[in-house]
C-alpha cells in the first residue's frame, strides 16, 4: 500500500525551461540554436558537473559558470566568458522567481492530502538554490520541511540508493510503502526502482520507452495532466 508519494522538482513540479529561455535570450541574443535541445543539454551538463560539488572539488558559483560555458561550447556557440556566465546565472535566478506549479500538480497534492498520504520532495542540486525554488513554488503549504531532501545536504544524489534510503527514513517508511514521481528515466525512475520503490515516469519528453527495458515495472505517463488519474488508481 502506498503511504507516501515523493516528487522530483525540476521538470516534474515546474518547467525550468522558460526561465532558461528568457535568460539565454538576454545574455546570448544572437544564439540561433534550438532552445529546447539547448535546455536539455544544459540539464545533462548540470547533472554531470554537479558531481564535482558533491565531491568538494568546486563551489556552487564555479559549478554554475562551468555548466553554462560547457553547454554553449557543445552548441558550437562563441566562447562564453566568466562574466557572461555569471550574468546568465543572475538572470536565470531572477526569472526563476516567476515559476509556478504545472497543471495537475496542485490537484494531485490536494488529493493526496485529502487521503492522508504523506508528500515528500527529493531533488538534486545545490541546497540554497533548490530551497529558493521551493519558496517560489510555495511547496511548504503541502510538504513538511522534514520531508524535503536536497542532494547537496546529504553528499549523495539521485540515482544513488543511499539518498532514496535517507528519504524513506525521513518519512519513517519502508520502500514498499513509497512511490516516486519524476521525469528523468535515469536519475528518478531507475534510482527509485533500484531502491525498491514504485515509480511514475512522466515521460513528457516522449523518450522511446522500448529502449529502457529495466523500466518495464514503472508506470509511464505522457503528461502531467495524466498524473492525478494514475495516482487515483494506486490510491483509491
Q: Which positions does each model-derived feature cover?
A:
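A structural motif corresponding to the C-terminal end of an alpha-helix
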Residues: 108, 115-116
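Asp-based, Mg2+/Mn2+-dependent phosphohydrolase catalytic module
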Residues: 1-5, 33, 106, 110, ...
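N-terminal helical cap/lid subdomain that shapes the substrate entry/recognition surface
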Residues: 2-103, 114
Amino acid at each position: 500500500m502506498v503511504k507516501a508519494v515523493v516528487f522530483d522538482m525540476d521538470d516534474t513540479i515546474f518547467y525550468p525551461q522558460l526561465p532558461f529561455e528568457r535568460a539565454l535570450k538576454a545574455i546570448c541574443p544572437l544564439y540561433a540554436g534550438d532552445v529546447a535541445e539547448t535546455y536539455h543539454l544544459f540539464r545533462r551538463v548540470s547533472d554531470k558537473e554537479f558531481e564535482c560539488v558533491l565531491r568538494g572539488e568546486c563551489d556552487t558559483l564555479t559549478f554554475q559558470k562551468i555548466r553554462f560555458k560547457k553547454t554553449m561550447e557543445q552548441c558550437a556557440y562563441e566562447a562564453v566568458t566568466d562574466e557572461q556566465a555569471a550574468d546568465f546565472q543572475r538572470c536565470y535566478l531572477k526569472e526563476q522567481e516567476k515559476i509556478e506549479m504545472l497543471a495537475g500538480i496542485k490537484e494531485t497534492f490536494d488529493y493526496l492530502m485529502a487521503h492522508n498520504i504523506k508528500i515528500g520532495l527529493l531533488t538534486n542540486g545545490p541546497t540554497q538554490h533548490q530551497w529558493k525554488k521551493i519558496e517560489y513554488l510555495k511547496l511548504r503549504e503541502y510538504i513538511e520541511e522534514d520531508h524535503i531532501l536536497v542532494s547537496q545536504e546529504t553528499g549523495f544524489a539521485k540515482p544513488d540508493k543511499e539518498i532514496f534510503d535517507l528519504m524513506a527514513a525521513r518519512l519513517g517508511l519502508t520502500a514498499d510503502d513509497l512511490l516516486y514521481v519524476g521525469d528523468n528515466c535515469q536519475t528518478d525512475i531507475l534510482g527509485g526502482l533500484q531502491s525498491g520503490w514504485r515509480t511514475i515516469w512522466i515521460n513528457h519528453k516522449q523518450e522511446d520507452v522500448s529502449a529502457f527495458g529495466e523500466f518495464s515495472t514503472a508506470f509511464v505517463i505522457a503528461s502531467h495532466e495524466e498524473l492525478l488519474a494514475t495516482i487515483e488508481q494506486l490510491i483509491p
